[in-house]
Amino acid sequence: MAPAADMTSLPLGVKVEDSAFGKPAGGGAGQAPSAAAATAAAMGADEEGAKPKVSPSLLPFSVEALMADHRKPGAKESALAPSEGVQAAGGSAQPLGVPPGSLGAPDAPSSPRPLGHFSVGGLLKLPEDALVKAESPEKPERTPWMQSPRFSPPPARRLSPPACTLRKHKTNRKPRTPFTTAQLLALERKFRQKQYLSIAERAEFSSSLSLTETQVKIWFQNRRAKAKRLQEAELEKLKMAAKPMLPPAAFGLSFPLGGPAAVAAAAGASLYGASGPFQRAALPVAPVGLYTAHVGYSMYHLT
């Protein structure tokens, strides 16, 4: 503390050379010890004033602090977590169980800790657009782990409309032969005469029409298939026309029409028509023997 020694030696009239060798400078031998004692006392007072006085009540885990937590709700949170304003001002939170001033000089303010991504201060410092989901149609930025191919979902495939399956023709397929009207009439006349031609007949007939034997053979095959389809259609029409049509009044009757019941009904109708004062026309009766089978039997076959 050289500056302090110079400041105290000037008012007391002590020279630097004399004080270095311990010789008094014209003031007597009794003034040097008193000046040194005063200087030491002043230095001790300055050091004591510079050291922070740590009271046991300020420690977070002292008995007084724990007792004060039970008395005052919310005191524990305020003692453990420093306020955001203190951190913003440059003050650093001391570790638990370590007195303040033991980690460094009390006068030099320590640098604030960097805020983590998931700490309370870090979440409060985030911008609003990071906390609120963006409503813009732009694609949000992805984190690095989402951009890796292992975690990113596969891109959506665009479903293309199914291609229309067309009939595949042979590459060596010959074009269809355009028959003339005279050729078609001659082929039809020959088909009506004979549906199957021998090899000699086919060769002679094809040469007369200026056609190949293969063309005549294929035409006869197609014509026979067409004739078969027409014949089956005619048979189906005949079967539909041959089905009997039942009268609507005969549903639910199990006795044969034209039997004794029909005769009795006809007799009763004739008597009923002649008995009254006014002549009434008799109801027409179905001829006897028209339907000889049971009605129920016919209905069974219709269903």
From Swiss-Prot:
Residues 133-142 have a biased composition (Basic and acidic residues). One of its GO terms (cellular component) is chromatin. It is found in: Nucleus. CDD domains: homeodomain (cd00086). One of its GO terms (molecular function) is sequence-specific double-stranded DNA binding. GO terms for biological process: activation of meiosis; anterior/posterior pattern specification; BMP signaling pathway; bone morphogenesis; cardiac conduction system development; cartilage morphogenesis; cell morphogenesis; cell surface receptor signaling pathway involved in heart development. Keywords: Developmental protein, Disease variant, DNA-binding, Ectodermal dysplasia, Homeobox, Isopeptide bond, Nucleus, Repressor, Transcription, Transcription regulation, Ubl conjugation. Interacts with CREBBP/CBP, TBP and SP1; interaction with these transcription activators may inhibit autoinactivation. Interacts (via C-terminus) with PIAS1 (via N-terminus); the interaction is required for the localization of both proteins to the nuclear periphery and specific binding of MSX1 to the core enhancer region in target gene promoters. Interacts with H1-5. Acts as a transcriptional repressor. Capable of transcription autoinactivation. Binds to the consensus sequence 5'-C/GTAAT-3' in downstream activin regulatory elements (DARE) in the gene promoter, thereby repressing the transcription of CGA/alpha-GSU and GNRHR. Represses transcription of myoblast differentiation factors. Binds to core enhancer regions in target gene promoters of myoblast differentiation factors with binding specificity facilitated by interaction with PIAS1. This is Homeobox protein MSX-1. The lineage of its organism: Eukaryota, Metazoa, Chordata, Craniata, Vertebrata. The gene is MSX1.
